[in-house]
Amino acid sequence: MFITEKQVWMDEIVARRASSSWDFPFNDINIHQHHHRHCNTSHEFEILKSPLGDVAVHEEESNNNNPNFSNSESGKKETTDSGQSWSSSSSKPSVLGRGHWRPAEDVKLKELVSIYGPQNWNLIAEKLQGRSGKSCRLRWFNQLDPRINRRAFTEEEEERLMQAHRLYGNKWAMIARLFPGRTDNSVKNHWHVVMARKYREHSSAYRRRKLMSNNPLKPHLTNNHHPNPNPNYHSFISTNHYFAQPFPEFNLTHHLVNNAPITSDHNQLVLPFHCFQGYENNEPPMVVSMFGNQMMVGDNVGATSDALCNIPHIDPSNQEKPEPNDAMHWIGMDAVDEEVFEKAKQQPHFFDFLGLGTA
């Protein structure tokens, strides 16, 4: 009879199970020793086809032949919600509650502490279902103890807290002994609050925001910001615009006709609004360039290094009769005469600042 390789392999598995040996069945020695054996019955082949082999079949047969076997015994092991199996209900551990304490639990804990005292925590935990002795102890000393001081920390307490932390470090239980009525948790939390406050105060962003909130920028100045005894000065402020000085490094000083200085808290440059209205009425443009503390207007460049034209108040409706503003002259240089002003009205030289040429 021809013996196939599959029959030899199945016969080897049956032999190894019968001898309770766990040697690898495909060793060449074992195969040659049992090559003459083969499956004699179809029952052996069915056993080999089952995933558990003949063990599962024999267990099923023994259970069916046992009259005392019942389905209730098969459920002897029970599985809890946590996935753990217990052989009997008597060996199940008590399920401990986790999470926030409920008001009913706090009331029950206060009653038990009043009966057993704040030291028998294991006994109290047996009476309070779902909580351990440690959980009851921490809840009492950190939240429910009537001796807890819940008032805000004073400056003196904060100073002592910082000194104690420099001495003891993060030993909060030891530090809490220096503060009667304060728990170690409250001491630790308030230390972190103080450190966060100090960090915010020393940060540059905090100082910058505080400075801006205390001194907000104002778009227009009032007479109170520029005290000056000259009466013409206030009239000039009411009819002119103010522009912030874009180049504070020039340090231009402002003077009136009578050399009365103008004081400014914000270091601003006063410019008459009608100074540049010549562009609107096709008048000769005035090119003004600034080099250091010098200003060049028209042809008046280099003759007097600190000269500046006296710009009058020009009415757009009457360009032929300009009325000079005697209250104020341009600032930072000496006053110039009428001849300089006439030169300023002439066609000035073109200054090619961008290098684009005349085209």
Swiss-Prot record:
Main localisation: nucleus
Phenotype of null mutants: Defects in organ separation due to abnormal cell division and expansion during early boundary formation. Failure in accessory shoot meristem formation.
SMART domains (UniProt xref): SANT
Compositional bias of kind Low complexity: 63-73, 82-94
UniProt-annotated location(s): Nucleus
Pfam families registered for this protein in UniProt: Myb_DNA-binding
GO biological process: organ boundary specification between lateral organs and the meristem; regulation of DNA-templated transcription
Sorted UniProt keywords: Developmental protein, DNA-binding, Nucleus, Repeat, Transcription, Transcription regulation
Annotated Gene Ontology cellular component terms: nucleus
Tissue: Expressed in organ boundaries.
Disordered: annotated span: 58-99
Location of the HTH myb-type domain: 93-144, 145-199
Molecular-function GO terms, alphabetical: DNA binding; DNA-binding transcription factor activity
DNA-binding region: 121-143, 172-195
Domain of life the protein comes from: Eukaryota
Function in brief: Probable transcription factor that involved in boundary specification, meristem initiation and maintenance, and organ patterning. Functions in both lateral organ separation and axillary meristem formation, in part through genetic interaction with the NAC domain genes CUC2 and CUC3 and the homeobox gene STM. May be recruited by a variety of developmental programs for the development of floral organs and the initiation of ovule outgrowth.
Protein name (Swiss-Prot/TrEMBL): Transcription factor MYB117
